[in-house]
């Protein structure tokens, strides 16, 4: 299983609208994607326009090829993209250690 970590900065004053949009986008678009497991969105405390979106995928290719290269990605970006103050920084991680 792969963890996608997206660091998102939105325009000031758009928190409520962005949070509604990202929830809708996850539920209606990303949840349909091949290999999707779960997603969480965290809002920054010190920087309230900053969000961390984490998504678990079965494989890296489920995100980078199937989702990003398929018809769902433009739908996703149409929902959340207008809120971005700058392009998100996206990285992928694999579990190295765990407890619980």
Residue spans for each PLM region:
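Short, flexible segments with low predicted structural confidence
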Residues: 1-2, 18, 34-36
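Short, surface-exposed ligand-recognition loops at beta-strand->loop->(often short) alpha-helix junctions
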Residues: 9-22
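Feature targets compositionally biased, intrinsically disordered low-complexity regions
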Residues: 12, 24, 34, 43, ...
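Intrinsically disordered, low-complexity segments enriched in polar/charged residues with Gly/Pro
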Residues: 14-16, 27-30, 41-44
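Residue-level signal for secondary-structure boundary sites
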Residues: 16, 61-63, 98-100
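An amphipathic, aromatic/His-enriched active-site/gating alpha helix that lines ligand/cofactor pockets
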Residues: 24, 28-36, 56-89
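Glycine-rich beta-strand-turn "strand-cap" elements at beta-sheet edges
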Residues: 40-52, 75-100
């Amino acid at each position: 299983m792969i963890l996608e970590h997206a660091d998102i900065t939105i325009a000031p004053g758009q928190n409520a609208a962005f949070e509604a949009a990202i929830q809708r986008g996850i539920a209606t678009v990303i949840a349909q994607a091949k290999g999707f497991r779960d997603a969480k969105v965290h809002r920054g405390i010190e920087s309230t326009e900053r969000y961390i979106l984490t998504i678990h995928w079965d494989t890296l290719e489920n995100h980078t090829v199937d989702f990003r290269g398929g018809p769902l990605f433009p739908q996703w970006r149409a929902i959340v993209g207008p809120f971005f103050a700058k392009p998100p920084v996206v990285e992928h991680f694999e579990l190295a250690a765990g407890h619980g």
